[in-house]
């Protein structure tokens, strides 16, 4: 049975390798788009009722939703600064949405102090965890244009191959092939993440024109 197969993948050793892995995941998620239909094609070419349960439908939809988070946040950020009145208020709302998961986790850690742990070490541990979470949010914000770009690219490639060309659906660059490449330099990062620079410059220009 396929459920008895174990697949092992080494954890990426740099950001670009992680991006390549997540791009593969996004393509795999969107290639399952036909499984959201009420009737699906079987191996012999005929169509039959979709055997997936409601929970399986929910998992598929949640994977698709996850790949659209970065593009949606980037669009909301642009509209917040350019397309709505009182942008400071809406920027605060967007920041609250972004920070709310971390705030809830920090509050949970702060309130659930083990009985045998003293207050000062507990506060230090909570502070270290909060700093790590907030640093992660800052990094995610800094690379948001790149995250949105590679997500949309993976989705577009999959939809093209799935609905139009119907070719190269199994064309992948595996993690082993990707990790065997030379260690990325600063120039490689700039080349791969040009969307960050372009997005920042565009936002500054548009903000100056519409402010």
Q: Across the structure, where does each feature detected by a protein language model lie?
A:
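Non-transmembrane catalytic domains and loops of membrane-associated enzymes and transporters
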Residues: 1-147, 161, 165-176, 187-189
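Catalytic cores of secreted or luminal carbohydrate-active enzymes
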Residues: 152
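Membrane-helix boundary/juxtamembrane motif in polytopic membrane proteins
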Residues: 179-195
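Transmembrane helix-loop junctions at the membrane interface of multipass transporters and ion channels
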Residues: 79-85, 200-211
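Core segments of transmembrane alpha-helices
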Residues: 70-71, 195-200
